[in-house]
Amino acid sequence: MCYSRQAIPPPVPNRPGGTTNRGPPPLPPRANVQPPVCSSENSSKPRENRVAGESLRTPSSSNPLADSQVNSDNIFQSPVLSNLKAPPSVFNKVQHPVPKPNIDDQSVDPLETNKFYTNMLLDDNTQPIWTHPYSIWFSRDPELFGLAANHTLASQRVFDTTTNPPRFYFNPTNIKSFVFKAREFVSSNDIKLEFRDMKHMSMCLLMSLSSSQFIEFPLVQGMGFVTAIYHDLGFELRSAVGFRSLERISVNERYGKYNIQLENNRNWILYLTSPDYSFPQDFQISLLDSNTIISSHKINGLICQLSADSVPSIDMAAGCYPVYCDLSGQTVDEHFTNYRFNYTVAGYSQSGTTLMYALPHHKAAFTPEMQEREIASSLDSTVKGLMTGYLTNSFDMQVQVPQELGFEPVALSLNKKADYSQEKLSKIREAAVQEVQLSDPQQESNIDSMYFSGKILAKYAWILYVTHYILHDENLTKELLSKLTIAMERFISNQQVLPLNYDVSWKGIISSGSSSQDFGNSYYNDHHFHYSYHVITAAIISLVDSDLSGVTNNSWLENNRDWVECLIRDYSGVDNDDPYFPQFRSFDWFNGHSWAKGLFPSGDGKDEESTSEDVNSCYAIKLWGLVTGNSKLTDIANLQLGIMRNVFQSYFLYESNNTVQPKEFIGNKVSGILFENKIDHATYFGMEPQYIHMIHAIPITSASSWVRTPNFVKEEWEEKMQPIIDQVNDGWKGIIMLNMALLDPKFSYDFFSQPDFNRNFLDNGQSLTWSLAYSGAFS
């Protein structure tokens, strides 16, 4: 069901039993020769435009930092993980029930499953994708078939009117402002869709009539133009909104520029550029009727570009378009990291650059050089504020990173490190002795869910950390280490209730359960949530085992490293040449956070329900990097965490001074489920306030203090949690109260240190030992 088309509260799928934890998902889960560098007029004669099927990878001409410096210190330079061999044989090989899309090579590269364009790969290929600021989809409407494009204004958003603040807002979808087709296309059955060069920030779509007759659409996040390149086909542009007027503004030796006014009063600019960059004066376009624009004749290689804004400076980018984005990064010092989106571009423009739009968190992180490339153009995004236009072939950014974040308890936002009195250590020891001696991690984790088993294992891993590094109790540590390693062995040998498989179709580690089990893990939902708990457990076991055995005898790590890194490669593969897993399956570098939805089509695009478990996924990678001595891995995780802090505080977690989200919505304090096209202040498992808020807090670790500021916690507590805390009598209460350690550690510690503490207040992934150790460290 596509909720975004109706101006009524979108229903939230129920999870059975009113469980206070995340339960089984609804059905279905989460419904729903080389390219030329873009040349400038002052450069030599431009090269011929590339033909489809050739590599999209060429260096960008715009590179404000020295390439030699970036490449030599590039934290993304392969190899990051030293062993990219086939997944362990314990994983059975299976074919995925979701067929692979029509791609140019059916056997070589792993396919992305959680990226902005995945919607278009599924079912009948008609679900929208969001490159931001545009939405794009394939229309099979018999009257208006082809590739449709649209941009929505903030004024078009639909807000819930039944609650204050509104529970949701969404943008209307499937408004066919423009539909690209060719005069030779008689019906949608004539069109063959082909998907090429599918990377984690870009892909290329072909609408083909034959091998020589096709329209090519490079789709790159943040692209300023919707670009179509016509190969031996006649240009035709249609609109369901309707064309009110078509005006030729100018025709020069490089391009033709036209103003198109739609019947909804929106004005768009159309640029037409010939492949030899010498625009023929006899080439004309005209209105055939109020829904159709056609050309006088065809030009093989005609570049057609639509812009939703009309500021004159956009002319400087006309004829140039991005086709691929390369990611690079460099550690500046212990506090900051630079990172760059380096766009490979094709075509020719007056400025030598293309047009790109940046989200607010990009703009906030831009280096001073980026200010010179900013133009007076801004377009609304769907759910992430106002985007700003730049004439550029790269985004150059710098963010603060949590270099000091490691295993030990810290409160980064309070600038506090652990300090325990003897009284507190005694209280922590009392809890630890009870939880270790009465525990059975092997039995507790013997369940049919990688998510819930991971939470349980990580709970005991943090107890293990406390017994060894805070209590310094070797006997207690050895007792729990033995239990925990036995529990982990079930998963490492793949003997759990629902074993994992290796999917040879899309290429990844998936559950053997059905699409409705374990939150849709078998369809690539939530992998970063699920597997990160296991990675954290492995990191802590490795750390403690190494300490007990001696630095030179870290046998547990070496014996199990391939299995752990297989999970990391699945949800956050860091090497672009890994033949078994896609790069960064879950994490979206343009949006600055992960997407939880996998191979399920959705009318509102990808979504994310838990910012805190997203943080946990990168925290897990950092901890594994620390324990294995992999500095590149820790640097990448630090960068992700640095980006996430800005992103979550802008788009997901709302302090009263938030200026990015609509002012009428920030009173919710948290997003709930954030989709690409809407925000719904809800969860997939219930509507209780503690569910909606604390799914963005769980699990509380040192990493929580990096993202959740004391002021945010204060506002959320006073406005949302304090009024209901006395009515919460289950595991969510413990999460709420440990979350308070980020604001008032003493208040939190006093709650957990009560002599008659009720353990029913602990979530199944939360221990009293860790709750006392974390809150007591700073009180």
Curated annotation (Swiss-Prot):
Sufficient for catalytic activity, as annotated region: 375-779
Localization of this protein: Cytoplasm
Residues involved in (1,3-beta-D-glucosyl)n binding: H530, D607, E609, E613, Y691
Entries under InterPro entries matching the protein: Endo-beta-glucanase, GH81_C, GH81_N
Domain GH81: 73-779
A Pfam short name: Glyco_hydro_81
Region (beta-sandwich subdomain), start-end ranges: 73-309
Reported effect, E613A: Abolishes enzyme activity
Catalytic center residues: D526, E609, E613
pH dependence remark: Optimum pH is 6.5.
Catalytic activity: Hydrolysis of (1->3)-beta-D-glucosidic linkages in (1->3)-beta-D-glucans
Gene Ontology CC: one annotated term: cell surface
Annotated effect of mutating D570A: Destabilizes the enzyme
Region ((alpha/beta)6 barrel subdomain): 415-779
Top-rank taxon: Eukaryota
EC number: 3.2.1.39
Keyword field: Carbohydrate metabolism, Cell wall biogenesis/degradation, Cytoplasm, Glycosidase, Hydrolase, Polysaccharide degradation
Annotated GO biological process: actin cytoskeleton organization; cell wall organization; polysaccharide catabolic process
Region called May provide specificity for triple-helical beta-glucan, residue ranges: 678-680
Outcome recorded upon mutating D518A: Abolishes enzyme activity
Other comments on record: Present with 1420 molecules/cell in log phase SD medium.
Homology family: Belongs to the glycosyl hydrolase 81 family.
Role noted for this protein: Cleaves internal linkages in 1,3-beta-glucan.
UniProt name for this protein: Glucan endo-1,3-beta-D-glucosidase 2
Gene (UniProt): ACF2
